[in-house]
From Swiss-Prot:
<feature type="compositionally biased region" description="Low complexity">
    <location>
        <begin position="503"/>
        <end position="515"/>
    </location>
</feature>
<dbReference type="InterPro" id="IPR002100">
    <property type="entry name" value="TF_MADSbox"/>
</dbReference>
<feature type="compositionally biased region" description="Basic and acidic residues">
    <location>
        <begin position="364"/>
        <end position="384"/>
    </location>
</feature>
<feature type="compositionally biased region" description="Polar residues">
    <location>
        <begin position="453"/>
        <end position="468"/>
    </location>
</feature>
<dbReference type="Pfam" id="PF00319">
    <property type="entry name" value="SRF-TF"/>
</dbReference>
<keyword id="KW-0805">Transcription regulation</keyword>
<keyword id="KW-0238">DNA-binding</keyword>
<dbReference type="GO" id="GO:0000978">
    <property type="term" value="F:RNA polymerase II cis-regulatory region sequence-specific DNA binding"/>
</dbReference>
<dbReference type="GO" id="GO:0000981">
    <property type="term" value="F:DNA-binding transcription factor activity, RNA polymerase II-specific"/>
</dbReference>
<feature type="compositionally biased region" description="Polar residues">
    <location>
        <begin position="328"/>
        <end position="339"/>
    </location>
</feature>
<keyword id="KW-0843">Virulence</keyword>
<keyword id="KW-0804">Transcription</keyword>
<dbReference type="GO" id="GO:0005634">
    <property type="term" value="C:nucleus"/>
</dbReference>
<feature type="domain" description="MADS-box">
    <location>
        <begin position="1"/>
        <end position="61"/>
    </location>
</feature>
<dbReference type="GO" id="GO:0046983">
    <property type="term" value="F:protein dimerization activity"/>
</dbReference>
<comment type="function">
    <text>Transcription factor; part of cell wall integrity (CWI) signaling pathway composed of pkcA, the bck1-mkk2-mpka MAPK cascade and the downstream rlmA transcription regulator. The CWI signaling pathway regulates cell wall integrity and pyomelanin formation. CWI also controls oxidative stress response, gliotoxin production, iron adaptation and asexual development. Finally, CWI is constitutively required for A.fumigatus to cope with the temperature increase found in the mammalian lung environment, during infection. Positively regulates the phosphorylation of mpkA.</text>
</comment>
<comment type="subunit">
    <text>Interacts with hsp90.</text>
</comment>
C-alpha cells in the first residue's frame, strides 16, 4: 500500500501546517544528517519558520560552512522551486524532503522559503536573480541579510572583510542573532559547542560579538555606556552603576567624573546622590587598584562632611523623593555584598559593631547607605558612622571643595585613631602570652570594659567586642585582623575551649597547653583528656551563639551524648538488633517473592 500523494501547495490551516512543518523539518534534518554521515560531506540546513524562529542543522560549524560557501565559485548544482514544481512523481524520499521549502514559501519571505531544502546559500543566487523582493542578499546571497533590515551596513561592509575567513564568519554571527533574537539558545547549541573543535581562538569572539550588536539594535535607549552592556536594558540613571565597576580598574579618573555627573543629573533630588555616591566609591574601593583609592574615596567624602544640620533639613522633605530610586541602587549594592547589607539598619552586625544603633535622627535610608559604606571600609578604614550618611547634595561644589581640604585630614585621622585603639588592645594580648596569670587579668579587664560581660578566657574577649548576640561570620574580616595581630593568632576561636566555670580551675594548665598546641587548635580531638573534655561545650556556644545560659545548657548534650553512644555497649546492642531486624525482613521478602511468583 503506497502512501497517498499530497498536492504540494500552501497549507492554509495553521494546525495542519505546524504539524506538517514539524514532521518534515525533522525528516529533512534526519536526511541531512544521514547524507553527511554516509557520504562524508558537510551539510547545512537553515529554516526560517513562519513564527520568526530559526531552525538549523549543520554537520559541522555553521559559521565555518557559510564562510567556505563564500570562497566557492558558482555552485556545481543549483536547484530552486521551479526544479521541483513539475516533478511530483519522484520517489517518496524526495517527497518527504523537498516539499518542506515549498510549504514554507507562502508563510515566509521568498529567500528563506527554499533555504531548508539544500545548503542554505544555494537558493540565494536563485532568488537574487528571480525574486525582486530578495534584493538584500546581494552580498553573495547569504540568507542572513533578508532576515533583518537594520544592520545592512554590515552586510555592505562584509565583502571587505572577506580577506579573513574567521572575520567573515564572525560578521555573519551577529547578524544571525540580530534577525532572530528568540532562537539564540538554539544557535548557542549549534554554534558554541562545535567551534571549539575548529578554531577555538576565533570562537570566543564569535560568541561575544553576537550579543553587543543585538543589544545595540534592540536596546537603543542605552547609548551612553558604550562598553557596559548589561544583559537587561535598564533606565539610564542605573547603567552608570554597571559601568562604573567595569571601568574602575582601567579608568579611575572617569569614575571621579561620573560621580559628580550623577549628582548633577539629579539636582532636585538632594538625597539621591547621598545613596548614589556612597555606592560608587564603595565599588571603587573594591575594584580600583590600590594606587587610586585615595583619589576617589576623597571626592565623595567631602560632600558628606559639610553641615549635618543642613543635610537633616533637606533629608526631611526629600525622603519621599528618594524612595523610588535608592531602593534600586541598594538592590544592586546588596547583590554585590550580600552578607553585610542589613535589612534593618539597627539589626546589622556592623551597626552593632560600630555603634550605629543609637543615632536615630538620620533617615533610615542614609543610615543604610552608611552601613554599606562601612561594610566596605570595614577591613582597612573604620570611620565615624554618623558623619557619612548625612550627605548634602553635591551641587554646592564650593563647600565641597572647601571641605575637601578639611576632609582629607579630618577623615584620615579617625581610621588612625580607631586603628590605634584596636592595637591598644592588641598589645594587651601580646603581653598576656608570657605570663598566664596576667593573661587572665588583662583579658577580663578588656572584655568587661568593652561589653560589660564577665569573661575568663582571652578568646572570649574578642568575640565580646562584637557583642554577645552578634553572628560571627560577618565581623570576621575585621575581628580576624584583630585576632591574627595578637600573638595568640587565629587559633583563638578553636583553642579556647574551657567553660566559664571550669576555666578558673584549669586556667594555668590550660594556658600552658594552649601556648604549646595553638597551631593545632583546629583539632578538638587533641583535647580529649578529662580536664579538657568540657572545653568543647563552652567552645561551641561561645563561638556560634554567644555565651547565653540556654545555649551553654543545650549544647553540651550533643557533645557528651554522641561519644558515649558510639563507644558504649548499648550502641553495639542496637547494631545487633538492627542486624537481626535486617535478617528477618530478608527472609520475609523471599517468602513474599515466592508467593508472588506463585500468584503470577
Amino acid at each position: 500500500m503506497g502512501r497517498r500523494k499530497i498536492e504540494i501547495k500552501a497549507i492554509k490551516d495553521d494546525r495542519n501546517r505546524s504539524v506538517t512543518f514539524l514532521k518534515r523539518k525533522g525528516g529533512l534534518f534526519k536526511k541531512a544528517h544521514e547524507l553527511a554521515v554516509l557520504c562524508s560531506v558537510d551539510v547545512a540546513v537553515i529554516i526560517f519558520g513562519h513564527n520568526k524562529k530559526l531552525y538549523e542543522f549543520s554537520s559541522c560549524d555553521m559559521r565555518e560552512t557559510l564562510g567556505r560557501y563564500q570562497y566557492y565559485g558558482p555552485p556545481h548544482e543549483h536547484k530552486g522551486p521551479e526544479d521541483f514544481n513539475g516533478k511530483r512523481d519522484d520517489d517518496d524520499d524526495e517527497d518527504e524532503t523537498t516539499p518542506a521549502p515549498e510549504e514554507m514559501q507562502p508563510t515566509t519571505q521568498n529567500p528563506p522559503a527554499v533555504v531548508p531544502a539544500h545548503i542554505p546559500s544555494h537558493p540565494g543566487f536563485q532568488h537574487v536573480n528571480h525574486a525582486p523582493s530578495a534584493s538584500p542578499p546581494i552580498s553573495n546571497g547569504i540568507p542572513f541579510d533578508p532576515r533583518h533590515g537594520t544592520p545592512q551596513p554590515q552586510g555592505a561592509s562584509r565583502p571587505s572583510s572577506r580577506n579573513h575567513l574567521r572575520r567573515v564568519s564572525s560578521n555573519l554571527g551577529p547578524q544571525q542573532h540580530h534577525g532572530t533574537p528568540p532562537p539564540p539558545p538554539q544557535n548557542g547549541f549549534a554554534y558554541i559547542p562545535n567551534p571549539s573543535m575548529y578554531h577555538p581562538n576565533a570562537n570566543p569572539n564569535i560568541a561575544q560579538q553576537p550579543r553587543p550588536p543585538q543589544f545595540a539594535h534592540y536596546g537603543p535607549q542605552q547609548p551612553l555606556p558604550p562598553h557596559a552592556i548589561p544583559p537587561h536594558p535598564m533606565p539610564q540613571p542605573v547603567p552608570p552603576h554597571h559601568q562604573a565597576p567595569q571601568h574602575l580598574p582601567q579608568h579611575p579618573h572617569p569614575l571621579a567624573q561620573q560621580t559628580p555627573a550623577m549628582g548633577l543629573s539629579q539636582p532636585p533630588h538632594a538625597s539621591i546622590p547621598q545613596v548614589a555616591q556612597p555606592f560608587l566609591p564603595e565599588q571603587g574601593r573594591n575594584s580600583i587598584p590600590p594606587a587610586f583609592p585615595t583619589e576617589q574615596s576623597q571626592p565623595p567624602r567631602p560632600v558628606s562632611l559639610p553641615d549635618v544640620s543642613s543635610a537633616d533639613q533637606m533629608v526631611g522633605p526629600l525622603k519621599v523623593e528618594t524612595s523610588p530610586s535608592p531602593p534600586h541602587q541598594r538592590s544592586l549594592s546588596s547583590k554585590s555584598r550580600s552578607i553585610f547589607t542589613p535589612i534593618d539598619d539597627r539589626g546589622s552586625v556592623l551597626a552593632r559593631h560600630f555603634g550605629l544603633g543609637p543615632p536615630t535622627c538620620e533617615s533610615p535610608r542614609t543610615e543604610s547607605a552608611d552601613v554599606k559604606a562601612e561594610a566596605k571600609q570595614n577591613d582597612s578604614k573604620e570611620i565615624k558612622p554618623p558623619a557619612q550618611p548625612v550627605a548634602p547634595p553635591p551641587p554646592p561644589r564650593t563647600t565641597a571643595d572647601a571641605a575637601r581640604s578639611q576632609s582629607a585630614p579630618d577623615i584620615k585621622p579617625p581610621p588612625r585613631t580607631n586603628s590605634g585603639q584596636l592595637p591598644s588592645k592588641r598589645p594587651q594580648l601580646k603581653v598576656q602570652i608570657p605570663s598566664e596569670n596576667s593573661d587572665r587579668g588583662s583579658a577580663t579587664a578588656d572584655s568587661s570594659s568593652s561589653t560589660g560581660n564577665q569573661t575568663v578566657t582571652p578568646a572570649k574577649a574578642n568575640p565580646d567586642t562584637n557583642h554577645s548576640g552578634v553572628v560571627l561570620p560577618p565581623p570576621s574580616p575585621s575581628a580576624g585582623a584583630i585576632l591574627s595581630a595578637g600573638a595568640t593568632g587565629p587559633p583563638n576561636p578553636f583553642a579556647r575551649p574551657p567553660p566559664p566555670g571550669t576555666a578558673s580551675q584549669n586556667s594555668n594548665a590550660y594556658n600552658s597547653n594552649n601556648n604549646i598546641e595553638t597551631p593545632i587548635s583546629a583539632l578538638p580531638s587533641r583535647f580529649v583528656s578529662d580536664a579538657l573534655l568540657p572545653s568543647p561545650s563552652s567552645f561551641f556556644p561561645e563561638w556560634g551563639f554567644g555565651r547565653s545560659g540556654p545555649d551553654t545548657n543545650m549544647l553540651p548534650s550533643p557533645l557528651t551524648f554522641p561519644t558515649p553512644a558510639v563507644q558504649t555497649g548499648p550502641g553495639f546492642a542496637r547494631e545487633d538488633e538492627q542486624e537481626k531486624k535486617r535478617k528477618s525482613p530478608d527472609s520475609g521478602p523471599s517468602i513474599e517473592g515466592t508467593a508472588k511468583k506463585s500468584k503470577t
